[in-house]
Amino acid sequence: MKRLSVLCSLLLVAAALGTELPLATPCDEEACKLPDCRCSSTNIPGGLRARDTPQFVTVTFDDGINVINIETYREVLYGRSNSNRCPAGATFYVSHEYTNYQLVNELYNRGFEIALHSISHRTPQAFWADATYQNLVQEIGDQKRQMAHFASIPASAIKGVRIPFLQMSGNTSFQVMADFDLLYDCTWPTTALTNPGLWPYTLHHESIQDCIIPPCPTASIPGPWVLPMISWRDLNNFPCSMVDGCFFTPDRTDEEGWFKFILTNFERHYLGNRAPFGFFVHEWFISSNPAIKRAFVRFMDIINNLNDVFMVNSAEVIDWVKNPVPIDRYRQQQCKFTMPSICRPSFCGPLTGTHNQLSYYMTICNTCPRNYPWVGNPLGQ
Ligand SMILES: *[C@@H]1O[C@H](CO)[C@@H](O)[C@H](O)[C@H]1NC(C)=O
């Protein structure tokens, strides 16, 4: 099994090295049509009017899932529904180290989306900028299998990627995504295309998106979608990709100020071209700032009661863009269904990390591995 996967990786590398990727050419709307191709643009998919377009809100959290941060997720997310009575979504970009996979299984069974954020989340950031195809096969491609195995969830449910530090390596992560059947990337910030906002698109053709953290892809790579991280604006109009990265903000104890700050950013989308509105944040920022947590909860309480706003898993946004329907038809659709997936937990450890000789403990939904799973040995065999 391991030898087979090594062989597969080698074949993929050979395929990647053997052919230089074609440079993307300017997008031709006539040649690039939904559901599988979309030019990068701020046009609303399907030519809908803004008032007929569902305003999607994507709440996302990054990094490991553990017994501490799950408390916040349970408190602020569980039991929420949108106005169409479908459960509200959120997406977790999970890194492997110190993740408790029993809790990943719990989030999955609650209908939330589990996505990839690398096995190691290693520093320095330059590692990701310079990452080779093989590096990213081991960090992202292999993580899909690892996540499915330890959290006992279907590999087909794992669709999204966010690279650590929002640091892309040009074409490479998208090539890996195409080869490992991953649907979309949510790593690429835009500060230029925020009002009106950039809608998700594919990389068949040249992207019009500004490259904030180079290198960005320039090849034609059919397959994966880009779900742009549309920046917020702070109180001095400086852009920020992650909410916890905004600089000039209301005081962290000012609930009312934060509530208005969130709404102001939301309204740029809601009263504009309704490009998906992202609330991209780390759990520590919410749990260590109770006033911001209350403001965030108030914001969700409001949007969960608006008839044209839907807090969804990020992959659901891509599903809608591929097949855009107006709000009234969207509201009639059935809610997404998650087939329950049982976790029989094993508490494993101490397991030695063969890369650093540290002892690790893991809670997983499978039999315990021999070694601590890591880059190059994702199942810890
Ligand atoms: C991406 O691929 C294009 C086309 O082959 C190439 O010109 C470009 O240099 C590549 N980008 C990086 C960062 O390697």
UniProtKB/Swiss-Prot annotation:
InterPro entries: CE4, Glyco_hydro/deAcase_b/a-brl, NODB_dom. It is found in: Secreted. Disulfide bonds join 27-39, 32-37, 86-335, 211-216, 240-246, 343-365, 348-368. It holds the Pfam family Polysacc_deac_1. Zn(2+) binds at residues 63, 117, 121. Belongs to the carbohydrate esterase 4 (CE4) family. Strongly expressed in the midgut. Has little or no expression in other tissues tested. Its main location: secreted. Its EC number is 3.5.1.41. This is Chitin deacetylase 8. It catalyses: [(1->4)-N-acetyl-beta-D-glucosaminyl](n) + n H2O = chitosan + n acetate. Glycans are attached at residue 171. The keyword Disulfide bond applies. Keywords: Carbohydrate metabolism, Chitin degradation, Disulfide bond, Glycoprotein, Hydrolase, Metal-binding, Polysaccharide degradation, Secreted, Signal, Zinc. GO terms for biological process: chitin catabolic process; polysaccharide catabolic process. PANTHER family: CHITIN DEACETYLASE-LIKE 9, ISOFORM A, PTHR45985.
